Amino acid sequence: MMFGGVGMATLPLSLIFAFKNRPKCVITRAQYVKVMAWQEVTDLAKRSNELGSPTRRKRLEERTKVSEKCEESPADQELVFLEDDVQALNEAFPQGEKADTSWALTVLFYLAKLVFGILGLALSVIWLLHIIVFMLVNPPAFPFLNQVFIQLDSAWGLLGTTAFAIFCYYLVMSVISGEMHSIYPMK
């Protein structure tokens, strides 16, 4: 029950904030490569050299037969941060033959997140109103969504069923989002 409530807030807001924090192409890729890319690439290379190869660490661990969690934890955490930085850099400035197509798909993906975030916010408000009007008041003040689904079903046979399926699917996605949402943003 708690995960659904958390998810009804986090699912649409995380989609909207993902759009808000999307990578924005303010300068051209050529300008970016000349000015900033070399610095970021060298920083990533330095960090990866500091970490060393994971296979070398595993071989060393197998040789010594000592596995201490305290010593592995900072290196593994730094490796996760490095992978996240590389992924963000590739997303913001795609490379290769189809870089323009990749950038266009990235923009469309973030626009879809905004649209689904706004729709999700509307569905969350409607679910919350239904819970207040129909479930918390005894006797129910108004059959709200029940009446809406019946009216949609009388308009066209599958319209009410489709709307009910969308609301149920959103409720399941909200519960999953609430369960997967981390309280502390630690990795």
UniProtKB/Swiss-Prot annotation:
Keywords: Cell membrane, Membrane, Transmembrane, Transmembrane helix. Belongs to the Casparian strip membrane proteins (CASP) family. This is CASP-like protein SELMODRAFT_416718. Residues 120-125, 177-187 are cytoplasmic. PANTHER family: LIMR FAMILY PROTEIN DDB_G0283707-RELATED. One of its GO terms (cellular component) is plasma membrane. The chain crosses the membrane at residues 1-21, 101-119, 126-145, 156-176. The lineage of its organism: Eukaryota, Viridiplantae, Streptophyta, Embryophyta, Tracheophyta. Pfam families: LMBR1 (PF04791). It comes from Selaginella moellendorffii (Spikemoss). It comes from the Eukaryota. Homodimer and heterodimers.
